[in-house]
């Protein structure tokens, strides 16, 4: 029969174990604290326009404000179409790092807000990121488990026969049931460092999900703005085609009366064909844009609902010359890179601890008797306490090279973190400049479109009165058509710059699922 040596029960043994466990508070390896590398402010860079140009842009802004009180006369191109609504007064961006940049501050179109909610709820990439969070949360829980004693229960039954020297063999039955405890004392912090690394992995994937959501919201808003731009472009092309058709009919009437040549008529026909061709082009692009937006929504290709006009989709903002660098530091991609670096630093500690002795304690307690009905009686009590020390002496360089690899990975992640910060600064600077200078471009484009609208109206009246040639009308209408398309494109680019600014500063979508 297997024998177990009885040892005196003493509370001193547990006191010793508790004292040894306190020594595990130390942890080898570098600190996981990270010094932020973001500057105190994020600059927009040197202003791209000289002071004289700035004075000119300011004068255009004042002129546009005065023009709103006296609408320009309509040309034949603009007759019958809804008036062009200017972009509203921009709001001031909050530069306080404690301010939560919410997308709901700038998304004014309820239809766009609904589309974003649908995308957040349905997008497969976001579902993948959220599933990874659950995966790494479980892995973190598994990494924390070794902090605690591992308890197992065992039961066995056997029939034994042993031979004794000079005697008859002995047969006996043995039934035992024991509870076993094993505990690795985290003297060097190997388990602690592993749990830290798992926690940083979890935080990294949480930031990855935030980055996926941030990109998704930005992409939906950008695609929707482009869709609304195509709607406006189609409206302009159709209005221009209809107006050109009216002028063409007038030219044909004059040709029939012998007042103009066939060349004039052919020129007008070519003029009308241009917006007609562009109309078909815009229709194709609009269908492709709806399909792209449907993909972001996690839905099959189909029609996309529309809200208000392009100018009302996004709230325009004004920005200062610089913003606090803390706005950059809270971007999810920057936070993710920081967490990856911290996880690598923690794994250096794991690799270092693997080269040091491992201290374990354990024991078992149970009962062993020949008959099952006599288990757990005082006569069958068995128990033991053990302590072990394991020291790696020769591993063929495996542990040393694992430590070297961990340090190299930490250097890699540190460089990646620094590169991510530089990329974030560049994107923020580009977005700041895009918003600031996009406003100037928009004002100039609005001024051009208004001036050409007046010029086209004058040219049409002069041609109808017979005091000017068809070339004057053709030139004025073509210039107006191009200016109107450019204005819509600039409006879309300006509002998209606002979207990119919120993305560059790590804006949050607080309307998720609501």
Kindly give the residue locations of the regions a language model identified.
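Terminal intrinsically disordered/low-complexity segments used for targeting and assembly
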Residues: 2-6, 10-121, 175, 199, ...
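Gram-negative outer-membrane beta-barrel proteins
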Residues: 28-30, 36, 159-165, 187-189, ...
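Sec/SRP-type N-terminal targeting helices
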Residues: 127-128, 144-145, 185-213, 263, ...
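Transmembrane beta-strands of outer-membrane beta-barrel pores
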Residues: 135, 157-161, 185, 297, ...
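Hydrophobic, lipid-facing positions within transmembrane beta-strands of outer-membrane proteins
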Residues: 175-183, 223, 323, 383-387
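Periplasmic alpha-helical coiled-coil/stalk elements that build and connect Gram-negative outer-membrane
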Residues: 191, 200, 207-323, 434, ...
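A short glycine-centered flexible hinge/capping loop motif at secondary-structure junctions
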Residues: 255-259, 463-467, 504-508
């Amino acid at each position: 029969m297997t024998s177990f040596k009885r040892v005196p029960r003493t509370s001193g043994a547990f006191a010793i174990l508790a004292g040894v466990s306190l020594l595990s508070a130390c942890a080898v390896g570098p600190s996981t604290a990270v010094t932020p590398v973001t500057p105190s402010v994020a600059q927009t860079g040197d202003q791209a326009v000289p002071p004289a140009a700035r004075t000119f842009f300011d004068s255009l802004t004042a002129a546009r404000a005065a023009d709103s009180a006296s609408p320009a006369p309509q040309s034949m191109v603009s007759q019958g179409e809804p008036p062009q609504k200017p972009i509203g007064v921009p709001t001031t961006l909050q530069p306080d790092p404690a301010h939560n940049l919410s997308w709901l501050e700038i998304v004014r179109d309820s239809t766009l807000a609904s589309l974003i909610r649908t995308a957040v709820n349905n997008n497969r990439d976001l579902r993948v990121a959220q599933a990874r969070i659950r995966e790494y949360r479980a892995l973190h829980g598994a990494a924390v488990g070794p902090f605690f004693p591992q308890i197992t229960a065992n039961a066995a039954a056997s029939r034994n026969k042993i031979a004794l020297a000079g005697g008859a063999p002995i047969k006996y039955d043995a039934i035992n049931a024991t509870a076993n405890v094993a505990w690795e004392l985290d003297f060097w912090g190997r388990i602690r460092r592993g749990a830290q690394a798992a926690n940083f992995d979890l935080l990294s994937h949480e930031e990855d999900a935030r980055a996926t959501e941030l990109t998704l919201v930005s992409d939906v808003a950008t695609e929707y703005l482009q869709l609304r731009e195509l709607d406006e472009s189609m409206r302009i092309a159709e209005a221009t085609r209809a107006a050109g058709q009216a002028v063409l009919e007038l030219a044909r009437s004059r040709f029939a009366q012998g007042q103009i040549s066939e060349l004039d008529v052919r020129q007008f026909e070519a003029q009308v064909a241009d917006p007609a061709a562009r109309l078909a082009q815009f229709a194709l692009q609009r269908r492709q844009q709806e399909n792209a937006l449907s993909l972001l929504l996690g839905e099959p290709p189909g029609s996309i609902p529309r809200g208000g006009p392009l100018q009302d989709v996004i709230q325009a903002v004004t920005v200062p010359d610089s913003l606090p660098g803390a706005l950059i530091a809270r971007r999810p991609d920057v936070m993710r890179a920081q967490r990856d670096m911290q996880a690598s630093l923690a794994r250096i500690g794991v690799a270092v601890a693997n080269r040091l002795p491992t201290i374990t304690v354990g024991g078992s307690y149970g009962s062993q008797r020949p008959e099952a009905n006599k288990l757990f009686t005082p006569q069958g009590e068995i128990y033991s306490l053990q302590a072990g020390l394991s020291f790696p002496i020769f591993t063929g360089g495996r542990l040393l090279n694992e430590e070297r690899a961990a340090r190299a990975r930490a250097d890699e992640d540190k460089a990646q973190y620094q590169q991510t910060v530089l990329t974030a600064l560049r994107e923020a600077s580009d977005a700041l400049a895009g918003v600031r200078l996009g406003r100037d471009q928009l004002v100039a484009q609005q001024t051009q479109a208004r001036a050409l609208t007046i010029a086209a109206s004058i040219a049409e009246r002069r041609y109808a009165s017979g005091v000017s040639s068809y070339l004057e009308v053709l030139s004025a209408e073509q210039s107006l058509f191009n200016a109107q398309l450019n204005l819509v494109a600039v409006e879309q680019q300006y509002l998209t710059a606002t979207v990119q600014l919120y993305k560059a500063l790590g804006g949050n979508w607080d309307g998720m699922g609501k």
